[in-house]
Curated annotation (Swiss-Prot):
EC number: 3.2.1.179
Designated name of the protein: Unsaturated glucuronyl hydrolase
GO biological process per UniProt: polysaccharide catabolic process
UniProt record similarity statement: Belongs to the glycosyl hydrolase 88 family.
Active-site residue list: 88, 149
Entry superkingdom: Bacteria
Summary of temperature dependence: Optimum temperature is 45 degrees Celsius.
Organism: Bacillus sp. (strain GL1)
Amino acid sequence: MWQQAIGDALGITARNLKKFGDRFPHVSDGSNKYVLNDNTDWTDGFWSGILWLCYEYTGDEQYREGAVRTVASFRERLDRFENLDHHDIGFLYSLSAKAQWIVEKDESARKLALDAADVLMRRWRADAGIIQAWGPKGDPENGGRIIIDCLLNLPLLLWAGEQTGDPEYRRVAEAHALKSRRFLVRGDDSSYHTFYFDPENGNAIRGGTHQGNTDGSTWTRGQAWGIYGFALNSRYLGNADLLETAKRMARHFLARVPEDGVVYWDFEVPQEPSSYRDSSASAITACGLLEIASQLDESDPERQRFIDAAKTTVTALRDGYAERDDGEAEGFIRRGSYHVRGGISPDDYTIWGDYYYLEALLRLERGVTGYWYERGR
């Protein structure tokens, strides 16, 4: 059922390997070509993750060789501390170094992932009880700020805690996850993109947005980060409240999916042709639904409901948004949005959308769960 879609992604990736060389794709800019960078952006781990997924599925050395080169690049980036003053270290190193460890049990990759976890730990602000999202400590705008994306960065810390036996990684990750649950998720199970706290004492100030439509609206990719992020943290922490939050957010999301199965970029905007979609939000959510289902008993009626919803979502992406391996396209799925209000790639390829689309396909086809936790955990 999914093999043709996976084959298209494999073919596109093989071509991209030759085109991109040692550079990393981020988003497209209105064309069918990716804008590349030299491993300086927050999204670069997704390219590495795609290559590891392709290698796991095929055993083809071209994907492995490309993936190993990316890990070497991430080692250099950490040594230089280049554009790492943010919480997305988890995205960057879970899908590169930690992926190599999971696939090959390479000790140097494991050490690199642990070193990256230590860098992420430096962003813990004990007085506020948060992992600061962006900027240096004491930043006047961002010093007490969290964003919902961070839930996908916490698995790097939780994995590091299991690998080393040091409870501090888990303590920090759990504290941040629980504070995110309390303040980022609204009473109706929608979500804020970002929340501000007093950096000196952790008192709540206000919720807001950076990439959503309004402070009070629900940015669909943020909701998707919450669905998958709370589910992943539940797997590590065994916290039923986190899993229940993921389920509630998933129900909220699914109740607002338009007829063709792929969401618009914000739940507040009109569902009409002139509004932008965000295919990446749907791809992330598909992975989150499958992760939730994997933690439910087979007797739970919602388990199959979430699996069916994930299949419906991936089918909608495959049939209405996915590119075919025709020699031209560089992305897997069209109509992703990066920053609509900012006018940055509002209707384009996104490398994270491509990664989660492929992860969802491989979860459905082979049970491959990505690189957020050890296999068989």
